[in-house]
Amino acid sequence: MLDELGQKIIKELQEDARQSFREIGRKLEISEGTVRNRVKGLVKNNTMKISAIPNPEQLGFNFMCVMCIEVKVGSAERVEQLLIKSPNVYFICGCTGTYDIIGIFVFHTPKEFDEFVKNVIANIPEIVRTSTFVAMHISRSPWEHNLDVTELCKS
């Protein structure tokens, strides 16, 4: 479980991951060394990751869709591994229910998506069927909103 200090450090990094450990320490009234050690531990135990999150729209990826994919029994992991090779895959996961895989894909244009379906999806024989949902607008995105660690840890 993440303790209160860990939560506060993560929240500070979510607000500005470029701020120094000294600055975070000053805000939280702890030493720079404590912040450095805690961040190192949080990264090492895979509680958090520090990285840049690009905004696909700002990079010209104006066509986003969610694709639900049904595959032949026992082939979900193989299909996932094939799909994640594509630079257009933003997110992919195995799931339960009617479909076996759900992915979020980004493209510059609908034509580029069409080419992806024809050249990638259609050439994976384990795919039984797909259902695609085009995003009309994005209400919450990882580049604009972070998980509220403090609220999550209360539950």
What is each stretch, according to the model?
Residues M1-S155:
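A compositional/biophysical signature of low hydrophobicity enriched in polar/charged and small residues
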